[in-house]
């Protein structure tokens, strides 16, 4: 089964096509809006949403053309439904639902943070449950015990401290 993944929770437009029978990512593409938002000192949700509107279809069309895949070969669409910025999330959900409706295929909402937790199993299938994951994504920094694909327990998280990384070194800021 070929599943298209769509990620628009903040300021990056991401798509990927996954083939379940071979457990393989056929393509992935990411467009970053970082330079645009740097002008304002942070992400401007309305600008992020508008940019997703302009980027999603051309990004998908380009990758399908590159891989010589017809859009009707996609059998399901998974999209980020939270957490994230409301406007960008709505753009991704709207695009996913419109495309799934037009292709008459399922549209599957995905929790962004839970997806990060399960990726460890995708990257390392031999990994057994339970395992512990350090999850750093956007404004979230968590230590999570993953009990199964559907069950997990947060065992630690930051309160008012964000973890920042740079090319030069890792640094903590509180």
Regions found by a protein language model. Name each.
Residues 167-174:
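Single conserved hydrophobic/aromatic residue that forms the stacking wall/gate
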Residues 1-167:
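Short acidic/glycine-rich loops and adjacent helix/strand connectors
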